[in-house]
Amino acid sequence: MTAKSRILVLNGPNLNLLGLREPTHYGSQTLEQIVATLRDQAQKADIELEHLQSNREYELIEAIHQAFGKVDFIIINPAAFTHTSVALRDALLGVAIPFIEVHLSNVHAREPFRHHSYLSDKAQGVICGLGAQGYEFALSAAIRALQAKQ
């Protein structure tokens, strides 16, 4: 019997406010609704899905470190840490778990300081501007990548 593949979904600062915060940029769905949809999608594919949202950079880094040897793929919306966190980049590189970077809004159509990501050049893929559906696309891509490895 093969062990289930595990995918970790990480969400950075202020994403706990989804549904309330700037719905024109981020949509009206709450993070809980987005994660529930992802859990259903993962369950149908026989994938174990874990989720963490944190406003604290170190908690996201610790989750990445703890994922080493236990998680097969990471989906991360680093939110504002996208543009500032060399530490998140180093953590992801350190564990060498493939990851997809997700953003609800099109960061390239927003303020110039949002255009740079410390993660994009190391990600397997980047999805931005597709709202909550971007997470579903990322999960589908991660599942396909894991199935291709088997």
UniProtKB/Swiss-Prot annotation:
Major enzyme class: lyase
Keyword Lyase: yes
Keywords noted in UniProt: Amino-acid biosynthesis, Aromatic amino acid biosynthesis, Lyase
Catalytic residue list: 26 (proton acceptor), 103 (proton donor)
The organism's place on the tree of life at top rank: Bacteria
Lyase keyword on record: yes
Listed Gene3D superfamilies: Dehydroquinase, class II (3.40.50.9100)
EC number(s) on file: 4.2.1.10
GO biological process: amino acid biosynthetic process; aromatic amino acid family biosynthetic process; chorismate biosynthetic process; quinate catabolic process
GO molecular function: 3-dehydroquinate dehydratase activity
Family per record: Belongs to the type-II 3-dehydroquinase family.
Its job: Catalyzes a trans-dehydration via an enolate intermediate.
Subunit structure: Homododecamer.
Protein name: 3-dehydroquinate dehydratase
Native species: Vibrio cholerae serotype O1 (strain ATCC 39541 / Classical Ogawa 395 / O395)
Gene name per UniProt: aroQ
